[in-house]
């Protein structure tokens, strides 16, 4: 069982997008830009995910990661349009890590950014999209080399390594290969809810 704040962060990093399971494949797997109506459906994934894990005792501490990871510092995020310190810190932290991962991950329609360019994007968006404190902390961890070393060690496509073990960013930078683990956990959650 996962215990403690670091464990909750690790599990939150893995499960934050679990609600996408409830999004129709025609939207979730679409390679072109989503229509406005489709985007409104996609924006429901934090609430869908929160409903999936609600009531499962050992997952209660990860609810803020799931529910608030799309809220932006300037209030233009979703699902509730919270801003600044209205957003639980788990959501503010995960947004920075998830954005870095998204920017540096190659997609079918674009190559991933060089990590240094992604760091610059975080810097430019702090105080707008991201909590300035967490951007600064992320950049400090980056400059110390622990994040870069871990990404090099894992080839960017593996589970976060021991190099991030003591960083608050540990396991919040999750590659898309973690989706398989997420789906396995989702199946267990659904089975537990049915019992």
Residue ranges of predicted features:
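Metal-dependent catalytic cores of enzymes that make or break cyclic nucleotides
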Residues: 1-192
